[in-house]
Each structure stands twice: as C-alpha cells, then as structure tokens.
C-alpha cells in the first residue's frame, strides 16, 4: 500500500504540472495614457496618487508639493518664494482623506492636514514626527488616521490629536511599515518591509 502512494503522488504532481503548463498564456491589452493635465504639474516625479470623496485627484510629488487636479486645472500647494513656510518639505509621500473630508498628507519632514473649505494647511502638532519621513497613512472607518514613519506607527483622531503610538518589532527587530489596510470587519492590518504582519481590532 505504501508503494502505491509513492507511485501515485508523483504521477498526480506531474499531471498537474503538465496541465498548468498547457494553459496558453493570454495577452492583455494595456492602455497607457498621460495624465490629462500633466503639463500643469510642477514636476513629473509622482510619489503617490489619491482620489478623494468628491472625485478630485491628488498627486504627491518629489519636491513639487501637493497637487489637486479637478480635471481642468491643477492647484499646487507648496513652499516657494511666494508662499514660504507652507510645508517643511515639498516631497509628498502619501495622501488620505478623513471622515470630515479633510486631506491628510505626509512629507519627508512631517505630516499636514488640508481643509478643503478654505485650503488652509496646518502641520500636525505632534512634535515627535515633525522631522521624520512619513511612509504611509490610512484613514479608517472609526474616524482614526494611522500614520507610519520608518519604524513607528501612530494613531490620530480627526482633530489631529495622537491617540496611540506603537513600535512594531518582527523577530526582535524594528522594521519599516510599508502598508496599512482596514478590512470589512474594521480590523487594521499593518505589513512591514522585511516581514511581519500585525493586526489591530
């Protein structure tokens, strides 16, 4: 009986391999188009793209600031000689929107909140992250905004007050957070660059 198992199992594996390899590869048509208003962007180097609840497209650029595209024109939010001190750093790394419709965005030196009613930008008041690169951020259905830096994870309410700080370690070592995701059950999942998956419920 043991000999039959030794013979049958390799045959099944062989047949499955042949069957999988016999499936013809399908070609997919991919259409690549330029952004309609790309000539209005301050730079061609985009670090992130986000569509808000009103349908506006937001672009985070490398050195060019935050850009809002309404389909006709691009409005740019950045520090320059006309508007000094708007942002500590003009490289926008990530963008999200909270439940009140405010745009949150991270840069290579801190995080900011933009009000869409008057387009006023204010820096997140948390001194801890003002000089750090923000790697990713996500707004969750409970009104919280999760923000990661290179090795730390922070949670804020929609007013910008910090409600949690987490140091994530995988196999005893701190690691860079590379994504934050909320599933349908409102569980927050966090992945790390060199391995590690964490959940908060």
Indicate residue ranges for each PLM-predicted region.
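Carboxylate-rich, polar loop motifs that coordinate divalent cations or form catalytic acidic clusters
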Residues: 1-201
């Amino acid at each position: 009986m043991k000999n039959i198992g030794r013979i049958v199992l390799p045959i099944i594996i062989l047949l499955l391999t042949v069957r999988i390899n016999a499936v013809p590869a399908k070609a997919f048509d991919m259409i690549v188009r330029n952004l309609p208003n790309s000539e209005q962007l301050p730079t061609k180097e985009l670090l992130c793209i986000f569509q808000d609840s009103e349908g506006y497209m937001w672009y985070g650029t490398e050195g060019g600031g935050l850009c809002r595209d309404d389909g006709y024109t691009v409005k740019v939010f950045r520090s320059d000689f006309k508007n000094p001190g708007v942002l500590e750093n003009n490289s926008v790394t990530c963008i999200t929107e909270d439940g009140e419709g405010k745009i949150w965005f991270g840069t290579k030196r801190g995080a900011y909140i933009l009000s869409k009613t008057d387009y006023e930008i204010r820096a997140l008041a948390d001194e801890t992250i003002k000089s750090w690169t923000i790697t990713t951020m996500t707004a969750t259905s409970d009104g919280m905004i999760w923000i990661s830096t290179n090795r730390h994870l922070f949670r804020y309410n929609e007013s910008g007050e910090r409600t949690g700080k987490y140091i994530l370690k995988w196999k005893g070592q701190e690691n860079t957070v590379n994504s934050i995701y909320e599933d349908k059950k409102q569980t927050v999942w966090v992945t790390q660059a060199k391995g590690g998956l964490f959940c908060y419920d």
